[in-house]
């Protein structure tokens, strides 16, 4: 067993995509035809479209009244090298009512451009117009997703630093002054995890008492991880997002939490809160992100438990563990399918200040990329990192169970209502 490296990299098979970079340089002799040119000078722009690319459509700005425009705008497409990728180039004329198509042509990227090659190609559109594109193709060797079953580098460093804290914690807890009773090598230091169950506010309140006892008894100093689901993650979020934790212990933070939970829930429906909800949802929708009831649920949970920390993000919690001063929090939830029973399909998703991912598939990302659009391991559309209260809504699995009860969703086994027996 001593020959086994617990940090060995187990590489998961992955495919590399291609990055196709197109620079729309300029156009010459843009024309709308003899009659059209007499009536109006073109306001040209160029549209690029690759059907096989996830972010398939790009366009330049339009330039007013110019038959020899210069754009010098660069666009990136992520391509699957196993598919035939065809670039469609369309020259358009901007108008107030409806834009006019002046012409189109195509270019087979897969057949005509090699990786590592850069070309400047003139494309004839119509009978007289030339559009000049500078194109390059390269292999995306640096991916935004990490494909591995091993721990990330930051967590490895945390584990190494936490060993020393745990050793001191065990010595203090058990009052061991004789070194021979303590772990003699780093490998002998036990990895202890504290796990909280799900169950909404009931689980949150129960876990708050457990954490208070573990903190005051010194057991928390012997732990490497704290993991939770649903209501337990709500308490973990409240604890780790508190600006004075860990210098201020759970006893004081629990007193603040008690006031928050005891407050009138109708305050969440006050006009100023409703306005904030609408503005946040509208901003997210305007950025192209999906808006679901989870957003609203997360806002309600956040306003109840962490009203002064609604802008806190998961990645910011690394400050609590950057010197291994606290156990590493692991927030979990289940990935399920709406049309398949969770008994048949359910994948665990784990969240930490370092990474978010699924160990089953060996796929992880940094917290700021959660919710982004990916293609073959590359983030093709990035969004601002989700706030912590949104993730609290995601982790709130109890809400999904209650919602299924309201809808009367039946489990596939035995025909009983899911969770019908308390």
Predicted stretch roles:
Residues 1-4, 28, 32-41, 64-72, ...:
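C2-type phospholipid-binding modules
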Residues 20-24, 44-48, 60, 75-77, ...:
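Structural signal for hydrophobic/aromatic residues that build the beta-strand cores
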Residues 55-62:
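Short Trp-Ser/Thr-centered turn/loop motifs at beta-strand boundaries
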Residues 125-191, 247-248:
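N-terminal charged/capping segments associated with class I S-adenosyl-L-methionine
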Residues 170-226, 257, 261:
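Helix-rich "cap/lid" substructures immediately adjacent to catalytic or cofactor-binding pockets
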Residues 197-199, 223-239, 331:
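Catalytic nucleophile loop
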Residues 219, 242-243, 249-422:
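Patatin-like phospholipase A catalytic core
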């Amino acid at each position: 067993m001593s020959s086994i490296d617990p940090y060995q990299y187990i590489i998961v098979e992955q495919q590399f995509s291609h990055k196709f970079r197109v620079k729309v340089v300029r156009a010459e002799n843009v024309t709308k035809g003899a009659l059209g040119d007499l009536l109006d000078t073109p306001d040209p722009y160029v549209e690029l479209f690759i059907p096989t690319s996830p972010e398939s459509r790009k366009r330049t700005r339009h330039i007013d009244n110019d038959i020899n425009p210069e754009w010098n705008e660069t666009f990136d497409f992520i391509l699957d090298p196993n598919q035939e990728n065809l670039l469609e180039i369309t020259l358009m004329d901007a108008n107030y009512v409806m834009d006019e198509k002046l012409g189109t042509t195509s270019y087979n990227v897969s057949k005509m451009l090699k990786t590592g090659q850069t070309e400047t190609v003139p494309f004839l559109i119509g009978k007289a117009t030339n559009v000049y594109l500078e194109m390059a193709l390269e292999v995306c060797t640096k991916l935004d997703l990490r494909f591995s079953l091993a721990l990330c580098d930051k967590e490895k460093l945390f584990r190494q630093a936490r060993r020393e804290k745990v050793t001191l914690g065990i010595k203090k807890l058990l009052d061991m002054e004789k070194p021979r009773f303590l772990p003699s090598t780093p490998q002998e230091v036990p990895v202890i995890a504290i796990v909280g169950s799900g169950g909404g506010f009931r689980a949150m309140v129960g876990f708050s008492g457990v954490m208070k006892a573990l903190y005051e008894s010194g057991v928390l100093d012997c732990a490497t991880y704290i993991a939770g689901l649903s209501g337990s993650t709500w308490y973990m979020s409240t604890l780790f997002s508190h600006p004075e934790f860990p210098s201020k212990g759970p006893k004081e933070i629990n007193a603040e939490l008690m006031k928050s939970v005891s407050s009138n829930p109708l305050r969440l429906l006050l006009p100023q809160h409703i306005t904030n909800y609408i503005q946040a949802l509208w901003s997210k929708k305007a950025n192209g992100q999906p808006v679901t009831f989870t957003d609203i649920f997360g806002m309600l949970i956040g306003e109840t438990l962490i009203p002064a920390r609604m802008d806190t993000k998961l990645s910011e919690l690394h400050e609590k563990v950057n010197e291994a001063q606290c156990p590493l929090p692991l927030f979990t939830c289940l990935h399920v399918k709406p049309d398949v029973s969770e008994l048949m399909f359910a994948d665990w998703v784990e969240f930490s200040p370092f990474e978010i991912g699924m160990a089953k598939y060996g796929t992880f990302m940094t917290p700021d990329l959660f919710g982004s659009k990916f293609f073959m391991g590359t983030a093709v559309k990035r969004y601002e990192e989700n706030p912590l209260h949104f993730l609290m809504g995601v982790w709130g699995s109890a809400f999904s169970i209650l919602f299924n009860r309201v809808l009367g969703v039946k489990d596939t086994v035995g025909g009983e209502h899911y969770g019908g027996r308390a």
